[in-house]
Amino acid sequence: MTPLFYAIIFILVLQYTVETVLDYLNAQHYNDPVPDELKDVFDVNDYKKAQAYKKTNYRFGLLTSTFSLVLTLCFLIFGGFEWVDQMVRNVTDHQIAMALLFFGIILIGNDMVTLPFSYYATFVIEEKFGFNKTTKKIFFLDKLKGWLMMALIGGGMLAAIMGFYQLTGPHFWVYAWGLVAIFTIFMNLFYSRLVVPLFNKQTPLEEGSLKSKIEAYAKNVGFELQNIFVIDGSKRSTKANAYFSGFGREKRVTLYDTLINDLEEEEIVAVLAHEVGHYKRKHIVFNLIASLLLTGLTLYILSLFVNNPEVSYAIGVSQASFHAALIGFGILYSPISEITGLILNRLSRKFEYQADDYAKATYAALPLITSLKKLSKNSLSNLTPHPAYVFVHYSHPPLYARISNLKK
């Protein structure tokens, strides 16, 4: 067992400890007095239901995170990675095939082990609180489709990156970065057209009052909008959402059918105005560029360490390899990922305020406020999160902060 092995153990335990403390602090705020501007979000019964939902998820989250830590530590300490590595070496000596088998066994194995937790969360917790609309058929089909996409896309990307590594040595990161950049831009453009239909049905928003109001707003702010779709999110959950995707002719707005059912038309337009604000303020382009730059930085740092056998030995294998080094590096690099995540979350919260301000300036504040309250009520959101939890985990400001900003 090498010093890096113990460093990995330390990182895993530290991350678990920090997350557990943050969850505990957040849970202590569940019973805090609700801010005056949010007292109309829940009635007495809904508030009790929201409290019960949060506490149930807190206890279940603690159980799953503890199980995950124990499983990972046992896998490391008792030679799980070495066992899988030797298994794939007995099947093939081709480096790329070996890596694909190695990651396939670990990822699908992990998914199978944690499947009962996912099943319980969906069919017990979400069902109990009235959110779940997923059938068992959809649940397991989603799993199978996810595995298939992981094999085709993830496996293809891994094989290509390893090919670059074998051909170019330490310069592989440049070519890998180029591949990831092309793929990321492609998915930003065509995600809704190619991936979403595998899981959901999308239909154009029908002619009527809502579509007319959306088109009138878009025209008023100079936002070219030809594609407005409704997605059948209600087949999985009662929770609502809306999102903007694509560029140019592939630009589209997608509204969940639950959103249309839960909100008034003016509130839906206000939500759309918020999404348009992200586009107009260049947040989407910024996030794309930031993601690509961080990916490039990560791949460059990986190239500096992937040839160091100690990075492979850190996960307990006896033979150094690209695939073992990837896992070792991923864990060792995770503290840096946490720091960049904090920075990006801070920027994201700032962008949310800017998008809210844009919606307020170009449409109105009141319908956005009422829509945010309804969405929070319908999802039993936490109205009094701990500031430290917000700082680490929230990509959006808490509801009370957004409403205070909109009322300025």
What is each stretch, according to the model?
Residues 2-320, 335, 339-408:
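Polar-ligand-bearing catalytic/cofactor-coordination segments
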Residues 318, 328-331:
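Alpha-helical transmembrane segments
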Residues 322-325:
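Glycine-rich, flexible loop segments associated with nucleotide phosphate handling
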